[in-house]
């Protein structure tokens, strides 16, 4: 296992590699909190945004995207709120990525090889070598995100931290259907 100091160094360094929207991280924690709900209960976006100390209006957009992707159930009405639509072991980081970041390709090529090479050599260019490299990176990223489930993350949290306060907060802020 890596030391905590080494893990922090890697996290700091990793931030410069690729940037996901802040909504992606918020979505992860929303799903982890919804997982703690008692059966037949929901939680409001206001309660979730208060706990995470994030904008309620922005979090509502995040939750709407999670509902659209089929990761969260939405119940309307006086006792309405949100709940998980599937267990954490069936939700991958890639599922969350698709919900929050969209289904577009990660790297959209501008096909600059032909203008880069010039008129004569550019005519010979088939596939842009930069695009090919970025496609390889994209496939690796998708594979990696698809291999990590929220259940794995949740198990690490449960093992490392005492969740008494969080569990009590969930019970206090959940609403029975």
Which residue stretches match the model-derived regions?
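Single conserved hydrophobic/aromatic residue that forms the stacking wall/gate
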Residues: 1-14
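A short alpha-helical element within helix-turn-helix/winged-helix DNA-binding domains
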Residues: 43-53
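Alpha-helical residues within the helix-turn-helix
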Residues: 50, 67-68
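Key DNA-contact positions within bacterial/archaeal DNA-binding proteins
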Residues: 57
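Beta-hairpin "wing" of winged helix-turn-helix
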Residues: 70-79, 83-85
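Conserved segment of winged-helix/HTH DNA-binding domains
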Residues: 88-114
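C-terminal regulatory/oligomerization modules of transcriptional regulators
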Residues: 109-177
């Amino acid at each position: 296992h890596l030391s905590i100091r080494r893990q922090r160094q890697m996290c700091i360094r990793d931030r410069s590699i690729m940037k996901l929207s802040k909504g992606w991280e918020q979505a992860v924690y929303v799903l982890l909190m919804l997982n703690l709900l008692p059966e037949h209960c929901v939680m409001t976006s206001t309660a979730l945004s208060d706990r995470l100390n994030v904008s309620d209006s922005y979090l509502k957009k995040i939750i709407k995207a999670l509902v659209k992707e089929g990761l969260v159930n939405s119940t309307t009405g006086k006792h309405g709120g949100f709940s998980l639509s599937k267990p954490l072991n069936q939700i991958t980081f890639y599922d969350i990525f698709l919900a929050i970041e969209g289904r577009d390709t990660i790297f959209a090529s501008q096909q600059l090889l032909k203008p880069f090479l010039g008129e004569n050599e550019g005519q010979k260019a088939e596939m842009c070598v930069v695009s090919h490299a970025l496609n390889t990176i994209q496939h690796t990223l998708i594979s990696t995100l698809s291999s990590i489930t929220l259940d794995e993350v949740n198990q690490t949290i449960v093992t490392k931290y005492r969740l008494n306060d969080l569990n009590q907060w969930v019970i206090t802020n959940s609403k029975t259907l």
